Each structure stands twice: as structure tokens, then as C-alpha cells.
């Protein structure tokens, strides 16, 4: 019997894009299983109104950090989720059959930074030799620390890492167990405003500051209409966040429990823009993977080009390509 599922998905996708899909056709669309980290995609879509009138069910799964989210993608327990550069590389390194279908670039403030206590004698990255750095294993903070150390001719062998979640990391920085913390917003804003920590080095010139929406190959094959629609909603939601920082901040604060003014500061000082999936982006992520291999954190070479699907560019909002 002729398999007409690809043709059927094409028709559904076209109807979805044109807003022509009705309740009967919507019933043919399988639920989209979306992995969410606290205060990220779900909060954004809900605050912007993009969870209304969705012609398929979104099934959310919550994860405390990028590492278990990547593991869920690898296991096929979810269809799509958002990861930074480093966690996505680790997911690919674990053999995950994933493709980046959307990229958002964050710019405008210290979105990632290596911070030290306000009275720390550490004045330069070179002073970190022999010191303890707290961050999340395989996180964007971990990668930032590696890149920052390299600027001073140091490697991970010159420091001691303490791997913890952000909620625990601030405590060990404040009590002196760690000498520095490699982290990201809103935590950079929290620790610099509340503990008066100093930014030793910003990640703005060291990292891409990209957020990757990665989908499983199976989901791309079986749920393309839903994915096309979902990435467009995410793009629209981030555009909304750029013009509604107070509302976006309030939505995040309700979830994280962090002070509202912290989220307002971050939201007002950050621009979130779509980035096309192109060769420059792929080269940038390849450099991340190669760095991890050189540090011995990846045991083999990974060709990251396999982890992108450029066909999704056509379904997204017009691009004003951010610097990479």
C-alpha cells in the first residue's frame, strides 16, 4: 500500500501556515512534546499569548537544567527543546539524532560572565590559576570558563572545577568555597546586584550567545507541521519580549522567585533576535565541539554540521542576522 503520510503532512503544514486548518484537521496533528527549562520557552510563549489558538496540543516537560533536557531529547522522550552551544554539543556527542531548527541570539548586556566576590584579590583571568571555579558541568558557563582561561594561556588543568546547579553555585561563591562562578543571566545580574560580585570577564566577546531549538529527527519526520508552527511562534514571542520587557520580566519572576527588578534589568538590556541557520553558525558550533575535544571532555571528533536543518529557515520571520 502506498504510504501517503508525507503528502498528508505537507497538506497539513500548508493549511496550518495559511491559517486554514479546522478542528477536524487539527485532530490529525499529534501532540508536540516540548522540553522546558524554568522561566524559558513556556513562560515566554504564555506571556506573549502564543499558547492561544494552537491547533495541536503542546505537552510540556520541565527540566532543571540543560543537561537532563539534552538527555531527554537523546532518549526521544521529548520532540524539541532549547539548549545553549555547549549542552547541544554534548547531546550530539552522546549520539543524539537531533537537528537545530531555530536559533535565537542574545545581545546587549553581560548575558554570560565569570564573576568573583567583590573583595576578591583576583583581578585578572590569569589570577585564577590554582583557584576553584563553580559552574554547571557541560553548561554554557563551563564553556565560558574554558574560553576565558584560554585568553590567559591557562587550561582546565590549571584550575579546579566545582559542578553545581545555579541555585547552589551562588552559595559556594558567597561562602568562599569557590573563588569564581561562570554563569549566565539572570544569575549574573542577581549576584552582581545583591552580592556586589565583580565581572572578571564577560562572555560577550568569547561566546556566540546563541540559544538553539533542537528537534529530534523522528519529530521532524512525523511532526513537521507542528514544528514549523512552533518555531514561528517562538520567533514572534521573542520579538514581543523585545518590546514588552516589563511584562516578560513579570512572567519570569513569577516562576523563578527571583526579584522582579532583576528580571526587568535583564529584559530591558537584552535584545533577542532570530538567526538564520547558515555555515557561519555551524562553523562557530564546530569550534565549540573542537574545544571540548581538545580539553578531553569529548572523547571523539564530532561533525556538528549533521545537527542542523536549514530547511526551517524558510518558515521563520525575516532575519536581521546578528553577529556571530
Predicted regions and their residues:
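Solvent-exposed, polar/charged alpha-helical surfaces in well-ordered, non-transmembrane soluble domains
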Residues: 43, 71, 75, 89, ...
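Bacterial N-terminal signal peptides
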Residues: 11-21
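Short, glycine-/small- and polar/acidic-enriched structural segments
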Residues: 27-155, 160-163, 179-182, 200, ...
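Conserved C-terminal helix/tail region of periplasmic/extracytoplasmic solute-binding proteins
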Residues: 293-324
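Periplasmic-binding protein-like
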Residues: 104-116, 194-219, 231, 270, ...
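Secondary-structure end/capping motifs
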Residues: 222-299
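Bacterial N-terminal signal peptides that target proteins for export
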Residues: 2-12
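Pocket-lining segment of extracytoplasmic ligand-binding domains
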Residues: 86, 161-162, 167-254
Amino acid at each position: 500500500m502506498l504510504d501517503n503520510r508525507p503528502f498528508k503532512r505537507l497538506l497539513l503544514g500548508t493549511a496550518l501556515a495559511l491559517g486554514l486548518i479546522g478542528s477536524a484537521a487539527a485532530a490529525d496533528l499529534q501532540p508536540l512534546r516540548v522540553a522546558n527549562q524554568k522561566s524559558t520557552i513556556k513562560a515566554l510563549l504564555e506571556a506573549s499569548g502564543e499558547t492561544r489558538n494552537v491547533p495541536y496540543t503542546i505537552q510540556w516537560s520541565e527540566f532543571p537544567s540543560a543537561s537532563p533536557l539534552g538527555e531527554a531529547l537523546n532518549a526521544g522522550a521529548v520532540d524539541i527543546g532549547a539548549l545553549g552551544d555547549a549542552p547541544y554539543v554534548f547531546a550530539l556527542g552522546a549520539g543524539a539524532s537531533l537537528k537545530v531548527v531555530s536559533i535565537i541570539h542574545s545581545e546587549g548586556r553581560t548575558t554570560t560572565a565569570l564573576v568573583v566576590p567583590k573583595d576578591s584579590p583576583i583581578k585578572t583571568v590569569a589570577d585564577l590559576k590554582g583557584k576553584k571555579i563553580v559552574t554547571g558541568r557541560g553548561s554554557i558557563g563551563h564553556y565560558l570558563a574554558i574560553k576565558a582561561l584560554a585568553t590567559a594561556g591557562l587550561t582546565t588543568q590549571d584550575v579546579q572545577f566545582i559542578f553545581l546547579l545555579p541555585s547552589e553555585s551562588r552559595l559556594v561563591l558567597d561562602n568562599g568555597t569557590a573563588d569564581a562562578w561562570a554563569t549566565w543571566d539572570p544569575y549574573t545580574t542577581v549576584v552582581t546586584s545583591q552580592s556586589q560580585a565583580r565581572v572578571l570577564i564577560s562572555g560577550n566577546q568569547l561566546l556566540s550567545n546563541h540559544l538553539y531549538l533542537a528537534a529530534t529527527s523522528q519529530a521532524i519526520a512525523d511532526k513537521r507541521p507542528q514544528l514549523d508552527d512552533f518555531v514561528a511562534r517562538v520567533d514572534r514571542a521573542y520579538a514581543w519580549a523585545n518590546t514588552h520587557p516589563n511584562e516578560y520580566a513579570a512572567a519570569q519572576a513569577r516562576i523563578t522567585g527571583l526579584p522582579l527588578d532583576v528580571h526587568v534589568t535583564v529584559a530591558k538590556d537584552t535584545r533577542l533576535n532570530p538567526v538564520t541557520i547558515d555555515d557561519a553558525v555551524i562553523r562557530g558550533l564546530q569550534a565549540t565541539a573542537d574545544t571540548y575535544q581538545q580539553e578531553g571532555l569529548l572523547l571523539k571528533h564530532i561533525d556538528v554540521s549533521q545537527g542542523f536543518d536549514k530547511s526551517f529557515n524558510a518558515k521563520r520571520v525575516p532575519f536581521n542576522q546578528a553577529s556571530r
